[in-house]
Amino acid sequence: MKAFIVRVLLIFIGAILLIQLWIFSSLVWWRTHEVDTTMFMRIDYWSDPSEPIIHEWLDYDDISDNFKHAILAGEDAKFIHHHGFDWDGIRFALERNNEQGEVVAGGSTVSQQLAKNLFLYNKRSFIRKGQETVATWMMERMWSKRRILEVYMNSVEFGKNLYGVEAAAQYYYGKSAKSLTREQAAFLAALLPDPKYYQDHRNDRKLQYRKRVILRYMNSTQIPE
């Protein structure tokens, strides 16, 4: 029985190490190559293979600065200054989770969200949060802030099977993300808490309020050069 437990434990440890190796090697490759698919995209495709994934890569310099400012105003105003983790946000999330007795808030930065989108799944759990932390730590040490934001903008979800700001700009406005106005950029950034719902509820009061807040603060955010 003891030998069996040891074997199971070794298999478990080996599996964890293989996952870390997969994440590490993927991050090495994506330092210089476009990210053409993510775990979130795969999950969407597996759930309904008849629905195509809409995704188009756009280089950092070809994305409107309006959107860069808007996405950071909405998701991670301290992005340029932290090393992957916003400890004030995490502290607030822990307090809320303790109050509720379950994971209801994440306090996630752009880097953490990207790690989740690339490698993990959406269901909240402490195990997923732990793996997200490891992947974020690796990413922040291997990629520049510019690269992290570039990949994030190209892989984040904006609606059902709709990924990346270029696909979103074409879908919502019939134009490239290169020419998004402040209003348009703020609207797209405001979608992110619940893009599949807001896709069909564009006049939702919470969405419109969030858009106004982003417009108010987007000029104060600092973006990577």
Swiss-Prot record:
Q: Name one GO cellular component term.
A: plasma membrane
Q: How does it sit in the membrane?
A: Single-pass membrane protein
Q: Kindly state which keywords UniProt assigns to this record, in alphabetical order.
A: Cell inner membrane, Cell membrane, Cell shape, Cell wall biogenesis/degradation, Glycosyltransferase, Membrane, Peptidoglycan synthesis, Transferase, Transmembrane, Transmembrane helix
Gene3D superfamilies xref list: Biosynthetic peptidoglycan transglycosylase-like
Q: Its Gene Ontology biological processes?
A: cell wall organization; peptidoglycan biosynthetic process; regulation of cell shape
Mark the transmembrane ranges: 8-28
What's this protein's function? Answer: Peptidoglycan polymerase that catalyzes glycan chain elongation from lipid-linked precursors.
Its name, as the record gives it, is Biosynthetic peptidoglycan transglycosylase
Q: Which organism is it from?
A: Acinetobacter baumannii (strain ACICU)
Q: What is the lineage of its organism?
A: Bacteria, Pseudomonadati, Pseudomonadota, Gammaproteobacteria, Moraxellales
- What is this protein's gene name? mtgA
